């Protein structure tokens, strides 16, 4: 009987326990740090990690946390500005040391009695966590937070927290390199084993700078009973778009049975649901649902508005709020149409809210070499410039880091859809290793849950170019054959189905269905690199015949602006091919022992070498050629909509100041000469001219959701002035379509070295878009010195030239807030741009001046 009463008393006691909220103690701030490599301290790693920082305090320096160590040492004057000159080479020692952090702290008395964790939002990379001399945990991924339970390990008074951390080089020292990658750098650093941003190990556009340190916030958490972890929001929109079901999964960690409620509210509609839940021991999901009728739909830029809903999740014990999270989301439906193409292969078209949308944009890389140092302001500026360039999509490339909430929030607000590669790029990965496999499983599960609420996040993709590497790059001829196939085709699809069935998953980029070549142009997505990196080389007119279904990586390089070049080159190295010039240059220029592809581009199109042109003219010539190439890339694909359904180029932004680069916005956020030509090529309504057989076809392209009416002016112009053909006709371009508006017989186009074809769209007497087509290279054409008249109107200026002007630039350094730049002037045809500055614009450079 006593046993029964005791058991009953225990049961009553358990049911009387009330859940308590989670308490936190911020442990960020000032820490102490020292370094060792087996000489500057104990040779034994274990002895080193248990170094008492108070025995020799002079060995330690103070650093802020969170902060990557290159940056912390730069602020302390021990490392020079990594963006300048040769300084990344001077800073490599930082990644080669084993670092030891230390911090003391005291805790409230209740923290000693309750469940407690040390939480690190990010550690890069391999970390050993020690509390009061005891190793309490390890961590080896920069892609997921670190949470270490320390219940019963805290002490009254002062606690000593020590973190031993290294960049990853020590951890892979005895691992297999050659079975996965055989380039020189990978044999040395074995990056494929490390779960951290891969671009740190050197890419063609970025030097090696292997990050290391405590790069995320640090805190102590404690609670008596349970804690709220991640909250997942999934949107399911009915076929008729009239009803949205928000499924909210709250992940709660508990240790005993108890009854609670979850209140889920949508603030904009006033709706809420109250869901009874039974807490079970462990980390488990608890689901609630909210139905919204006639929801306001979220659209990508150019297709509609971006209304956002605020969802509040509260964990209740009676009337007491134990925990809450406020989450912002949007309601939209994403599908990919892969139906059969009437000619060959399949379509690959992203459909948003039952409407086909042509994807326009660029590839995104971390905008700093030290990726944890990217500010919200920098992200805001870059996304603003993307929107102004008429983007509606960014592709987050797989060699980087999670987009993160700050970037995705901005994309949500501005209407930028996101194609997000998972974090694998250009390598075989050890998916056959259980520890690596388990880490990937944890990492992908965490990321898919964490970023689920963002309406901008449209597509998850398994990796960047790992499939095509085996198919086309000879990866099947060495080492392990597709050791990571199971990750992208088995493990991750299961995770996606369980965690986020609301978004499409694509196994690799590029990838094609039906077990065909991953780079097939007629199915799946494509990386059309034959221009720049393949057989076509510098001839970007090859783009004119490309029929790719969904090109999302391909591009043309160009030099950064003179102002940027001078900012990162030391005064005594401000000349072409100086040591710092080459160090900051794209690696592609050194793949062969001959002048690199950038120099070949200029010589191919202009017939002049870099030496012929000289420092300043060469930089502008290279930038102008990039503008031409990207215009060809974009215009070819846009005229083919929706046989082709995207024009996404490589790449949008830079991680450091580059001599030549793929980007249209450089590291210092200066607009390169290609920026405005890309903006015009992406504008919602435009015209494109293309030669097909013996006919010049004039296309009207309209990716807006309404028909466009106006006037088309088209014909053949002479570079020296006058028009051989000059026609006008009223036109209608259907909504969300490309259509042939007119044509010119090739018979009418004579003496092509002195003439070009043109098209202009006008509405209400104002020019909306213009396009010109040449079939002879610039070096073979007859350019004249122009006389340009500039006149002021009401809030505008108008430029008019007596002869054709190629690439008139009013801001060669990309530093001014000009509404347009690097535009052609057709002979005798006014070109008007908005202008409110008191000072009139001046033409600083034209392509004509290169001859």
Q: For the regions a protein language model found, what residue spans apply to each?
A:
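Active-site rim elements
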Residues: 91, 202-206, 479-483, 616-621
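Anionic group-transfer/hydrolysis microenvironments
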Residues: 121, 134, 397, 423, ...
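Active-site mouth of glycoside hydrolases
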Residues: 143-147, 164, 170, 174, ...
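Substrate-binding clefts and catalytic carboxylate motifs of secreted carbohydrate-active enzymes
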Residues: 25-26, 30-43, 206-213, 225-226, ...
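Secreted/periplasmic carbohydrate-active enzymes, especially glycoside hydrolases
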Residues: 1-10, 17-393, 639-640, 670, ...
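Glycine- and acidic
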Residues: 295-296, 390-394, 610-619
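Soluble or luminal CAZymes and related metallo-dependent hydrolases
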Residues: 97, 378, 439-443, 483-488, ...
């Amino acid at each position: 009987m006593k046993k029964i009463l005791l058991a009953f008393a225990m049961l009553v006691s358990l049911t009387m326990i009330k859940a308590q909220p989670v308490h936190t103690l911020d442990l960020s701030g000032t820490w102490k740090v020292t370094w060792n490599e087996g000489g500057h301290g104990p040779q034994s790693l274990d002895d080193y990690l248990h170094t008492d920082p108070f025995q020799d305090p002079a060995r330690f320096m103070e650093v802020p946390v969170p902060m990557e160590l290159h940056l912390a040492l730069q602020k302390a004057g021990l490392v020079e500005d990594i963006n300048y000159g040769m300084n990344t080479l001077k800073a490599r020692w930082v990644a080669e040391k084993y670092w030891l952090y230390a911090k003391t702290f005291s805790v409230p008395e209740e923290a000693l009695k309750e469940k407690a964790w040390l939480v690190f939002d990010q550690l890069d990379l391999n970390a050993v966590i020690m509390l009061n001399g005891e190793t309490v945990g390890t961590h080896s991924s920069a892609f997921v937070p670190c949470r270490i339970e320390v219940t019963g390990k805290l002490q009254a008074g002062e606690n000593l927290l020590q973190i031993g951390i290294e960049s990853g080089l020590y951890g892979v020292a005895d691992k297999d390199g050659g079975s996965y990658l055989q380039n020189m750098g990978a044999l040395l650093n074995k990056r494929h084993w490390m779960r951290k941003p891969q671009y740190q190990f050197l890419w063609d556009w970025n030097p090696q700078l292997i990050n290391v340190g405590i790069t995320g916030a640090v805190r102590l958490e404690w609670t008596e009973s349970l804690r709220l972890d991640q909250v997942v929001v999934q949107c399911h929109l009915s076929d008729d778009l009239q009803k949205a079901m928000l499924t909210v999964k709250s992940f709660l960690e508990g240790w005993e049975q108890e009854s609670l409620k979850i209140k889920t509210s949508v603030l904009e509609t006033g709706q809420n649901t109250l869901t009874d839940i039974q807490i079970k021991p462990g980390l488990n999901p608890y689901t609630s649902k909210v139905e919204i009728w006639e929801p306001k739909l979220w659209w990508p830029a150019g297709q509609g508005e971006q209304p956002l809903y605020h969802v509040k999740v509260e964990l209740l014990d009676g009337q007491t709020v134990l925990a809450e999270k406020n989450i912002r989301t949007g309601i939209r439906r994403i599908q990919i149409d892969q139906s059969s193409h009437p000619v060959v292969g399949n379509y690959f078209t992203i459909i948003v809210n039952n409407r086909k949308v042509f994807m326009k944009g660029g590839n995104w890389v971390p905008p700093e070499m030290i990726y944890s140092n990217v500010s919200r302001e920098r992200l805001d500026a870059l996304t603003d410039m993307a929107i102004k360039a008429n983007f509606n999509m960014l592709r987050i490339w797989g060699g980087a880091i999670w987009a993160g909430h700050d970037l995705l929030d901005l994309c949500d607000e501005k209407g930028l859809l996101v194609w997000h590669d998972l974090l694998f790029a250009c390598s075989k990965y050890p998916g056959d290793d259980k520890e690596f496999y388990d880490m990937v499983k944890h990492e992908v599960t965490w990321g898919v849950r964490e970023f689920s609420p963002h309406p901008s996040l449209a597509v998850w993709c398994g990796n960047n170019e790992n499939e095509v590497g085996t198919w086309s790059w000879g990866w099947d001829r060495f080492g392990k054959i597709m050791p990571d196939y199971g990750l992208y085709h088995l493990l991750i699809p299961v995770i996606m189905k369980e965690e986020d069935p609301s978004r499409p998953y694509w196994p690799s980029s590029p990838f094609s269905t039906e077990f065909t070549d991953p780079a097939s142009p007629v199915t799946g997505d494509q990386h059309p690199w034959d221009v720049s990196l393949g057989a076509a080389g510098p001839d970007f007119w090859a783009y004119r015949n490309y029929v790719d279904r969904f090109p999302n990586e391909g591009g043309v390089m160009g030099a950064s602006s003179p102002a940027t070049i001078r900012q990162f080159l030391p005064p005594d190295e401000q000349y072409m091919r100086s040591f710092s010039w080459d160090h900051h240059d794209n690696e592609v220029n050194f793949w062969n022992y001959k002048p690199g592809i950038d120099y070949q581009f200029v010589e191919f199109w202009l017939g002049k070498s870099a030496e012929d042109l000289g420092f300043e003219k060469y930089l502008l010539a290279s930038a102008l050629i990039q503008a031409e190439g990207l215009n060809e890339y974009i215009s070819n694909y846009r005229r083919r909509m929706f046989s082709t359904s995207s024009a996404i180029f490589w790449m949008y932004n830079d991680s450091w100041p580059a001599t030549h680069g793929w980007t249209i916005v450089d590291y210092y956020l200066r607009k390169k000469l290609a920026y405005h030509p890309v903006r015009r090529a992406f504008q919602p309504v435009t015209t494109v001219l293309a030669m097909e057989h013996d006919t010049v076809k004039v296309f009207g392209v309209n990716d807006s959701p309404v028909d466009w009416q106006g006037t088309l002016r088209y014909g053949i112009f002479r570079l020296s002035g006058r028009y051989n053909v000059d026609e006008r006709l009223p036109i209608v371009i259907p909504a969300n379509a490309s259509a042939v508006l007119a044509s010119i017989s090739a018979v009418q186009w004579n003496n092509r070295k002195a003439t070009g074809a043109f098209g202009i769209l006008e509405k209400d007497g104002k020019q909306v878009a213009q396009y010109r087509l040449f079939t002879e290279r610039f070096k073979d054409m007859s350019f004249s010195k122009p006389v340009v008249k500039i006149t002021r109107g009401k809030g505008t200026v108008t430029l008019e030239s007596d002869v054709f002007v190629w690439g008139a630039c009013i801001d060669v350094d990309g530093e001014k807030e000009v509404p347009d730049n690097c535009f052609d002037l057709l002979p005798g045809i006014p070109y008007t741009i908005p202008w409110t500055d008191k000072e009139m614009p001046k033409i600083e450079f034209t392509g004509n001046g290169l001859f």
